[in-house]
Amino acid sequence: MNELKKPHILVCNDDGIEGEGIHVLAASMKKIGRVTVVAPAEPHSGMSHAMTLGVPLRIKEYQRNNRFFGYTVSGTPVDCIKVALSHILDDKPDILVSGINYGSNTATNTLYSGTVAAALEGAIQGITSLAFSLATYEHADFTYAGKFARKLAKKVLQQGIPADTILSVNIPNVPESEIAGVLSTSQGRSRWEENAIERNDMYGNPYYWLNGTLKLLDDSLRQDEYAVRRNYVTVTPLSCDLTNHTFLDSLNQWNLQK
C-alpha cells in the first residue's frame, strides 16, 4: 500500500514518551498505518483532562536508539493532542490511540485518567479515538495488549464509532492463553477508600502521600473492573457528554423557575 494511502495514526499517552507502553503501541500501529507519536515529556498520570494555562509549552523531537521516534510536549496529555493538531501534524489523523497505560482505567479510575482524557480530547476534535490500558502496576507484559490494540484499531477503521464517543479498552496482564474473552462493558462503579500517609520533613513540617484501596461497588461481568479482574478484555464506549439524561426529565419537573 502507498504510504500516503495508509491510515494516519496519532499515538499519545500519559506515562510520558519513555513509557514502555507507548513504544509497544507505536510499533504495533506501524504495521497498519503511518504513525506520529506526540507524548508528554514527563509522566502525567492522574491528570484527567487538565491542560496548561499561563505557562508556555515546548515541543521537542525525541530520539530512541539514535532514531527519530516522535515529539515531546512539556505539558499534559490533552496539551499533546491540542499542540499536535495545531502545530505538528500536516494532516488530520484518521484515528488516535492513547496508551498503553501502565495500570487499568476502569470504573472511577476513568475519571482520573490522562490516557482516557487524551482520547476524549481527540473525540472532541472530531477524531476517532481509542484508549488502551494494561491492568497492572508491576511486571507489565504489553505483548498481548499491543496485539489486541492493533486488531481493534483495524476493526474501528473499518466500522467506525459514533461521534463524541471513544472506546476505553482494559487488558489483563496475563498471557494470551489465559485471556477469558473479550466483553463490551459499561463503566463500573467504585470508589477509592483513601489513606493519606502523614510524614514530617526535616524541619518538622507535615506532608502527605495519597494512598488507598479501590473498592468495587458492583459484581457484574458487564462492568469493566469486575470483568478485568476475571481476565476478560473489556471494551467500554465512553461519551464526551456527561449529562445524566435519565435524571434530566425528572429535573425538568422540579419547576425551578419559581
From Swiss-Prot:
Domain of life from the UniProt record: Bacteria
Pfam families hit by this protein: SurE (PF01975)
Necessary cofactors: a divalent metal cation
Main location: cytoplasm
GO CC terms of this entry: cytoplasm
Subcellular location: Cytoplasm
Cofactor binding mode and count: Binds 1 divalent metal cation per subunit.
Catalyzed reaction equations: a ribonucleoside 5'-phosphate + H2O = a ribonucleoside + phosphate
Keyword Cytoplasm tagged: yes
Gene3D superfamilies, per the entry: Survival protein SurE-like phosphatase/nucleotidase
GO terms of molecular function: 3'-nucleotidase activity; 5'-nucleotidase activity; exopolyphosphatase activity; metal ion binding; nucleotide binding
Listed EC numbers: 3.1.3.5
Known role: Nucleotidase that shows phosphatase activity on nucleoside 5'-monophosphates.
NCBIfam families listed in its UniProt record: PRK00346.1-4 (NF001490), PRK00346.2-2 (NF001492), PRK13932.1 (NF010542), surE (TIGR00087)
Record's protein name: 5'-nucleotidase SurE
